[in-house]
Every structure is written in structure tokens, then in C-alpha cells.
Amino acid sequence: MRKLFTSESVTEGHPDKICDQISDAVLDAILDKDPNGRVACETAVTTGMVMVMGEISTKCYVDIPKLVRETIRGIGYDRAKYGFDCETCSVITSIDEQSVDIAIGVDEALESKKGEMDKLDAVGAGDQGMMFGFATNETKEYMPMPIEMAHKLSRRLSEVRKNGTLPYLRPDGKTQVTVEYENGKPVRIDAIVISTQHGPEVYLEQIEKDIKEHVIKVIVPSELLDENTKYFINPTGRFVVGGPQGDSGLTGRKIIVDTYGGYGRHGGGAFSGKDPTKVDRSAAYAARWVAKNLVAAGVADKLEIQLAYAIGVAKPVSISVDTFGTGKMTDEEIVSIVNKVFDLRPGAIIRDLDLRRPIYKQVAAYGHFGRTDIDVPWERLDKVEEIKKHI
């Protein structure tokens, strides 16, 4: 049976991704000075303006306007002709402390209040909710091919802009890849869509030629392309006005880009700007860590795990898995292995993945999962041998 599946990515200059990177820059700056700081930082951008808001409890001081301007400069919005300038945009901040009611549940979990605790039971989940982790062996990154290819194309777009290969490119851009599957395995790429912001002096014909030569051919293996592959490069014909001048942006608006491109389910909680006591982030990272190690250990070819939490309670209220018919054992047996090998209380996740560190801005663009260009703890295959002992 053949089917098509499509995923998209965006560049670091996309308005929503600007916001994600600013929120995580603030988080990293606080964790660097105060590893126990509590951060829930949201950002909004529009023409000529950035607003940073949220709830932050910390003993340290960070210069938020300076962080905002440095982040925007690093992305590439450093002159007025790009429609957004790190030097002249206004920066508005509105920061409160974390709610005392939330802090009570995080600082002392329900298990602690009942006296049923060890040290790690003392950290309660920062909110209720469900988080999903996913892995598949269809790529070496253990990621679905559509999102993996889309991210690589987006990263390449920024690379050729920054290194001067295509100097007329500007920071905003999007990619989309449609993969054809046969009997559950990727066999070819059916369509590639790339929209990239550019200077007014360049024509579409030149952009199409350059993107195919310097982006697509460099990234996509030739054996996945054929005479029937369709290319859509700046299909509107012109993309000069972009970034926050073209669209307003918000933190947490690209949660599918951040994860599995729609191939795996999503619990709905965004990542950026949240410290690791927020299970929206830390438990989603842990779920990816669990799923990737299980697939690498040969438990299944494809696996999705769901974790669910109650606010102020340390232990997950439920754990479930789905192997989509590829499992080498029952789902119940896999859950049993998960409970034996992994400790999924928030305090244990923070400890085992060493999450109280400034490591988040680097994943705020081009995906939080499947990253081989950087070292992030939830991508490590450090539990494979232990899992195999239980198979």
C-alpha cells in the first residue's frame, strides 16, 4: 500500500520561531545563574516591537531587553531594510512572579504531603496534561523522514544565507516535504516546497535555480528524487516582506514543527520559555528519550508513548504505548519494561537528563528531536543495553 505524508519546518527568522528563541534565551540566561529558577516566559513580536511577558521566580538578574536584541541580531534582523531591526525595535517587558499556588505543588508533591516519599517524590508536576514521545527506525535519527528532511532544508536555507553563498536571502523562510511510503517504508520524495524571504533585486528564476542547486541537491539524497518529484519554490512569486513585518509571532505556535511533524501525536503543550519543572517540556523530552531507546533496542520499528501527570503529583497517572503493529512484544510488556528502566517522576527526569542547565535556546529552532548537530541528553541511546536485558 502506498501513501503520502507531509511535514513542514520553518527557519530561525520565522516570526513564531523568533519568539521561541527569545523565550529560551531568557530561560537559559536565568538557569545559567540560578539553576533552580522558575520560568514561564512568553514572547510576542510584530512590526518594530517585541513584548516579553510571563512569570519568573529567581534570585538572579538578567537584562531581558539586551537578550532580546542579541537574539534578534543573531538571527539576522540587523538592518531596517529587512523590515525588523534589532537596534531600533522597541522592547516591552511585563514579568510577574510564579503563582504561590502553583509553587506549593511543585515544591512539595502530594506524595511528600502524605509522607509516602523519597527525595525525588518531593518535586511535583508543574501542571496536569499528557505528553507524547515518538521514534521510528526509518531514519538514522530515529525520526520520521518528512520532518527530518524539512528541518535539514530549513537549516541549509539559513546556512547559505549566513555564509554568503546566497547573499540576497533574508531570515524568514519555510520548507515542506511530502514523502511517499510503500508498506510503511519511505521510498521517494513526492514534493518539496520552499518559501524564502529575499531582497527585492533578485528574480524568481534565479531563486529557483539557486535553491535547487545550493539547498535541495546538497541536502536531499538523489535516490529519493525522480522525474515525478514536484518542486514549489516561492510559489507566490515574491517574498520580500517577511519576518515580524509580514506576520506577528508568538511563542509556542510551532509545536508540530518542534516535534514530529504531525507523524506522532502531540499533547498540546509548547516547550520554549518553560523551565524543566514544567512537564509540558521535561516529560515530552523524557518520552522521546524512552521511545528512541526502545526502538533502538529492537522492541519495535515504530513506537509512541504517552505520559500523563496531575499537578502537584510526582508519579505519572498513566503510561501507555502504541507500536502500530510493529512491536516484538505486547504493549503491556513494553510498559512494564518502561517502569523498570525509567523513572518518570519530574525530579528524576530533571536529574537523569540534567535539565537545570542553559541548553534550550539551541533547540528553539530546527526541532527539539532528532538533532545530530548538537548534543542533547534526551537523544542519547544510553538505556539500550538495559532494555535488552528485559526483552
From Swiss-Prot:
What this protein is called in its record is S-adenosylmethionine synthase
For this protein, the record's CDD domains field holds: S-AdoMet_synt (cd18079)
Give compartment(s): Cytoplasm
Q: How does it assemble?
A: Homotetramer; dimer of dimers.
GO BP: any one term:
S-adenosylmethionine biosynthetic process
Q: Which residues bind Mg(2+)?
A: 16
The annotated pathway is: Amino-acid biosynthesis; S-adenosyl-L-methionine biosynthesis; S-adenosyl-L-methionine from L-methionine: step 1/1
Gene Ontology MF annotations: ATP binding; magnesium ion binding; methionine adenosyltransferase activity
Task: Give binding positions for L-methionine.
Answer: 55, 98, 247, 278
Q: From the UniProt record, list the reaction(s) this protein catalyses.
A: L-methionine + ATP + H2O = S-adenosyl-L-methionine + phosphate + diphosphate
| NCBIfam families noted in UniProt | metK (TIGR01034)
Explain the purpose of this protein.
Catalyzes the formation of S-adenosylmethionine (AdoMet) from methionine and ATP. The overall synthetic reaction is composed of two sequential steps, AdoMet formation and the subsequent tripolyphosphate hydrolysis which occurs prior to release of AdoMet from the enzyme.
Gene source species: Clostridium botulinum (strain Okra / Type B1)
Entry's EC annotation: 2.5.1.6
Q: Which residues bind K(+)?
A: 42
- Cofactor(s) named in the record: Mg(2+); K(+)
Ordered alphabetically, the record's keywords are: ATP-binding, Cytoplasm, Magnesium, Metal-binding, Nucleotide-binding, One-carbon metabolism, Potassium, Transferase
Q: Which InterPro entries match?
A: ADOMET_SYNTHASE_CS, S-AdoMet_synt_C, S-AdoMet_synt_central, S-AdoMet_synt_N, S-AdoMet_synthetase, S-AdoMet_synthetase_sfam
Its family?
A: Belongs to the AdoMet synthase family.
